[in-house]
Regions:
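Structural preference for beta-strand elements that scaffold enzyme active sites
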Residues: 37-39, 71, 105-107, 132, ...
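C-terminal alpha-helical cap/extension of soluble enzyme domains
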Residues: 11-14, 41, 226-230, 237-325
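A general structural signal for well-ordered alpha-helical segments in protein cores
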Residues: 57, 89, 93, 118, ...
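Catalytic alpha/beta core domains of metabolic enzymes, predominantly
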Residues: 169-265, 269-273
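N-terminal secretory signal peptides and thylakoid transit peptides that target proteins
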Residues: 1-17
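Active-site beta->alpha loop and helix N-cap motifs at the rims of alpha/beta catalytic domains
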Residues: 32, 46, 51-168
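C-terminal segment of N-terminal export signals and the immediately downstream linker at the start
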Residues: 22-54
Length: 325
């Protein structure tokens, strides 16, 4: 625990490069501690017509706030970002920022086909009062280190908001993140998606830099990662309240209690690996009708079968005592 406090003290001592920049009145300066924790990747709800369901999206925002998430991210991979149009990303980014109203940090996904599109998203995110930016690599999946550096540098050049970067191509290694962190002061969160995220977290933490290591992977390694002094995870929305409890209990020194909740969460995370992101939508549908349906934009086929649904029944029954909403 003392090592965790030492790292956080180090983080707190390094001011964000964005602190000196002017921001829209509705934006806030995030402390280093506020950049850590459970930053949920929001799901994107659709009507049967495949248009985005704004009412359900707003309910998801409120649901996540009530789950006490440390932050939320939209759009990103779990939010079917590649299926969204340019106009939709602009319109519904503002819907989310307006709905959340500063109750928890909102990071807007700014990745694009190229640096010019990404720069436009980044400018817009700051204009509407987002708290941070989240970026994957360019949509051509470039792994060229020079091109990737140019792309992320361009994003950082048009906004002083803290930047979260998600590993999304083979060229985005831990070494790449460390080099990029030296170059871009606003690059604060490195989201690791490699085959062995816990080991890469240890490498990032051991380097003693200002980067905060976060992970994807559905949160399946969360306890292991926290033991290595991770800065959080970015998983789906369905069991957000359990994720928050795991994080908060662990960092309060209640490791056994955190593991007990994690065991309930892990059963869902394992099922998601087989069923895909549709599971998150099914959970949100069941949890008080946050979503009205489970429509995915890429397929009309419902990919969960009877046995999957029965397994989810049992998982949700076991997790119910930990639901906040």
């Amino acid at each position: 625990v003392s090592f965790t406090l030492d790292r956080r003290s180090f983080l707190a001592a390094s001011a964000l490069a964005a602190a000196a920049a002017s921001r829209p009145a509705q934006a806030r300066e995030l402390t280093d501690r506020q950049l850590e924790g459970i930053y949920v990747i929001m799901q994107t709800p659709f009507h049967e017509s495949l248009e985005i369901d704004e009412d359900s999206l707003r309910r998801e925002c409120d649901f996540l706030v009530k789950c006490r998430v440390h932050g939320m991210v939209w759009p990103a991979g779990a939010g079917e970002t590649t299926s969204l149009s340019h106009a939709e990303r602009l319109q519904f980014s503002k819907v989310i920022v307006d709905e959340v109203r500063g109750r928890t940090p909102v990071f807007i996904g700014v990745h694009g086909a190229n640096k010019f599109e990404a720069m436009e998203y980044a400018r817009y995110a700051e204009k509407i009062g987002a708290d941070g930016l989240h970026a994957m690599g360019p949509s051509d999946d470039s792994s060229d280190a020079e091109m990737l550096t140019e792309y992320f540098t361009a994003i950082a050049s048009v906004s002083k908001l803290p930047l979260s970067i998600q590993e999304s191509t083979p060229g985005m290694t831990t070494d790449f993140f460390l080099r990029l962190g030296e170059k871009l002061p606003t690059f604060r969160i490195a989201k690791i998606e490699s085959a062995n995220p816990p080991h890469e977290i240890s490498r990032l933490v051991g380097a003693g830099r200002h980067l905060i290591p976060s992970t994807g992977g559905g949160g399946v390694n969360l306890i292991n990662e926290m033991s290595r002094n991770s800065g959080g995870t970015m998983a789906g929305a369905g069991f957000a309240d359990l994720q928050v409890d795991i994080w908060n209990l662990y960092h309060a020194g209640k490791h056994a209690e955190a593991r007990k909740v994690f065991e309930k969460f892990l059963m869902m995370a394992v099922l998601e690996r087989e069923t895909g992101f549709v599971l998150q939508k099914e959970i949100l549908r069941r949890r008080g009708g946050v979503f009205k349906n489970v429509v995915m934009r890429r397929t009309r086929k419902f990919t969960m079968d009877r046995e999957d649904l029965a397994e989810l029944d049992a998982i949700m029954e076991g997790a119910k005592p930990y639901f906040r909403v």
